[in-house]
């Protein structure tokens, strides 16, 4: 436990130290009741009461902020890195508050110069720096401290040369005091020349305790220098005494009621402590305050100087940004300061900017209650031209779609649960609202490549011939049109996210050539960005969840009248991913990242007092998103009435040898995790940590999974020579790019994975399953068109893929001289793990010449605890329900392959469905599974089977290993539990005790509870990228 004594002695308690109104001599009696004995006017007394109320709230807030920091430090080490990390964390929670936690220097180690070193001997603790409370403060210009050796006093003196001696002394006093707001010492101008280095304390107006001014200045300079080091500034703009200064006028804020939203017309300032709770407009900061309502707003506030830093969190990027570029918590401009939303505090234009945002918010929340029509008597029927009859919830959805297109939003997000007919509702909209102009008539539909043909079939089968649009598919070898006019001659154009990403990349290259006045090597038309679309529809819109990808940036750049997102899971990896959809839809003001992150991303990621920002977020969702689940009721009845679904968790213990192997792996992983924690390098080693977690999860299934591919490798000289030759063919710029990647994210499915394959020579990478899918899809196309020249292409740059020139990321690290995926001194390197294998599993090493074939060879095959558990469950189902079919899901294809041996031995007929099969093979497997009564089991990989399949012929689901995101599992289960299912569905989750799997399930439960309770019925499917606490929990290093 950390000793916080040094920190606690800096506790701010200005109630006892600051008179409330120095001008009017109004203060408090000893029992803290107002003293009305003075001759102050009633207005002044009213102001005194209000100031006292606000001061008490402010003090309570600061105490909570300090207590929060103590709580962060409670279970932490006392190292400088840990302290800095916790300081950044706490400061980041309150970006609009002008108090700040800062490092407190050890005065014995300080010298009077500005060159304070950032090391443990200099900084020993932390301190809370806060402005004076309850006093009107003058608007004093900030001081710039030059680090070339000029002293603070010389700097101040140089700015007061033109003033009289008394004016200069007074200004020196004010400026010096303004620099360090939290201490009890105030610098005053001494009456005697020999006493000018003394100060008096303000614990009492009559006390004159002497404190050495030099020590105080050293402390101030140490704090400022630490900020300068964080910013890498040659000089530091000092914190000024800026903040709201209230006049005698007092008024309640005007506000408008829009349902339960209060839109306060207020000006956000550096310190707006009238809105600590954070309700009302997006301007309001979050707080730990217990206050529920904010009734009072002061007008006519005064602002500080241009050169100020809002101390609302340390910068994540230590480099100075370019002018006008936004940062995470803080925005820095060369000539002036802007607040977190980008409003210029010292510009006369400020009010206009806020008025514009107020109008944008009013437009966003306009007519919320009228958007959904629940009255069946006024609900429109199936539109002419649509073949299927719409279900009632689809009719309701169509009216919502039409209403949003007719509003200022001109689009939104249809987020109905899987199987509720998002596609048919979108087609109904196309039929109902055709374009009025022939020049702008084309609807662009962007979809994953696997759904292209499905969309085409839906259009042909769902829209009547009398209304049927002309359709063009722009993908692969079928891309016959190169200019915008050709595309715009069709009613509907179907394409993929990869095509948009590729064209956006070309656009960036073209724009750069124009900017640099460089010769253009090859002119290419950019038809998607040159066209003016009537409507753009993103199917599986979560594909653009990462706002920085080429696909996301390209989609946002498309020009269209109407814009729609279709997605059953609009968020999967954090609130910030929802921003990408909002940006595409151009929903103001939140299409601006600074506004979105300030109002939602930062406060919702803090997990502290998220009630107010969550309410605002739900308001945003209600304004632009429609979501119904299978259990949603319409006209008093559920949308769908399905057979019951029963989920059972089957817990099992690993065998003693399996558990010994697992514990050894976990111990090594914990050592590595602690090392990254101590170094503060969790983010940069995120990929390595995923590998460690992957190995723990694999060990719960079967020890072979960990060393399977390594054991299958012929690690002789010829193998090394061949792969090094492949490595040498990677473009040099690609090698440099690969060395800098921090997160192993597949460029096609966007999942963060532990195993990537690098395409040579372009250096782009895919996960093994996606790469296999790209190759097999190309082979399918070649067969369908009888064109043997069709070859697979990279999904990023569309360079041809040579299947003989693929390199694993692990080998790339070896050949490029990078460190192994874990450190060389760690026991978790592959060769060491192989030595740790229990004896009964070591035959995979002894028979490495068999490669992956050993997984399906009965002579060498070895079972595991989890295989036996699943096998017994399958046999029990077959015995009791001889006609039922079973789906078995796993994230690991090689684990599914291990089941083929016992199934053959037991005479259980099965089929496989993985990304490694061609499209034709997968389709045939589904047909055979449905029509052949003898086929009882379908072994299916989680990635291949969680979208786009109808498997209602099965009513038993076995999940072999839990996934981080519970909603991915639920999507897989819904392959069986959907329209067409006529039997009860039984789900069996096999979990090993005392392993990472228990912690994954606990993490799932916490996430599900948080999301479903916060975002309503079933909620949106948001699972955060694993943070440090979650990683520690998964490695078994913390209890929660």
Curated annotation (Swiss-Prot):
Zn-finger segments (RING-type): 746-798
Coiled coil: none
GO biological process, one term: double-strand break repair via homologous recombination
Alphabetized UniProt keyword annotations: ATP-binding, Helicase, Hydrolase, Metal-binding, Nucleotide-binding, Nucleus, Zinc, Zinc-finger
Main enzyme class: hydrolase
InterPro entries for the chain: Helicase_ATP-bd, Helicase_C-like, P-loop_NTPase, SNF2-like_sf, SNF2/RAD54-like_C, SNF2_N, SNF2_RAD54_helicase_TF, Znf_C3HC4_RING-type
Gene3D superfamilies: P-loop containing nucleotide triphosphate hydrolases, Tandem AAA-ATPase domain, Zinc/RING finger domain, C3HC4 (zinc finger)
Presence of keyword Cytoplasm: no
Molecular function via GO: ATP binding; ATP hydrolysis activity; ATP-dependent activity, acting on DNA; ATP-dependent protein-DNA complex displacement activity; helicase activity; ubiquitin protein ligase activity; zinc ion binding
Pfam assignment, any one: zf-C3HC4
Keyword Nucleotide-binding: yes
Stretches assigned to the Helicase C-terminal domain: 866-1032
EC number: 3.6.4.-
Chain positions recorded as ATP binding sites: 416-423
Record's GO cellular component terms: chromatin; cytoplasm; nucleus
Lineage: superkingdom: Eukaryota
Location relative to the cell: Nucleus
Family: Belongs to the SNF2/RAD54 helicase family.
Protein name: Uncharacterized ATP-dependent helicase C23E6.02
